[in-house]
């Protein structure tokens, strides 16, 4: 039994939100003309389905039920976004996908913090890897639009772009942490103090 209401809700929400993201990427991949972009976005969709599966594994470990409310809510959101990708042009799907992924990075590190606060470190490696994968997604989308003429205007109003992010992870550096299974390397660092990652 997991006695942490915030963590339970975060797990339920993440599980359903990953489905919304996967649906959105289905529409995004279908809307682009470049075959390489289609392939890359479809791989990101696969990553989201895998994350959903991994979150469910954690939920099952604690007999946490799936939220019907979140499932319906994010199903609708995902399908609406998927359809909209065909009518809003090339730039906007890439921009808002990157912005979304930027925030998702923090969610998995927040899960780790919550687990650690109640003495559980079993999922440290999994949650780090999921957070890092979301960061890789963010960087992919940003690289696609970083020189686009619309980006400065969107960044000004939506607070994400070349100069702003919703996390402070740097994939060019490494951090080591120990777990019961040994030492693991992860390709990230903090621009500020390590503890700031979990605020």
Regions found by a protein language model. Name each.
Residues 1-199:
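Non-heme di-metal
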């Amino acid at each position: 039994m997991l006695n942490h209401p915030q963590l339970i809700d975060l797990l339920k929400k993440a599980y359903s939100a990953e489905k919304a993201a996967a649906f959105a990427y289905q529409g995004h991949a279908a809307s682009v003309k470049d075959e390489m972009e289609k392939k890359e976005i479809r791989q990101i969709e696969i990553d989201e389905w895998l994350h959903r599966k991994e979150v469910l594994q954690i939920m099952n470990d604690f007999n946490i039920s799936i939220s019907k409310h979140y499932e319906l809510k994010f199903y609708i959101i995902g399908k609406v976004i998927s359809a909209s990708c065909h009518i809003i042009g090339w730039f906007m799907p890439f921009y808002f996908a990157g912005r979304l992924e930027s925030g998702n990075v923090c969610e998995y590190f927040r899960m780790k913090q919550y687990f650690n606060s109640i003495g559980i470190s079993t999922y440290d490696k999994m949650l780090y890897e999921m957070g890092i994968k979301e960061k890789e997604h963010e960087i992919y989308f940003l690289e696609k639009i970083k020189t686009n003429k619309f980006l400065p205007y969107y960044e000004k109003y939506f607070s994400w772009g070349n100069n702003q992010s919703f996390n402070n992870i740097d994939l060019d550096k490494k951090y080591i942490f120990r777990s019961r299974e040994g030492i693991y390397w992860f390709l990230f660092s903090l621009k500020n103090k390590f503890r700031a990652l979990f605020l």
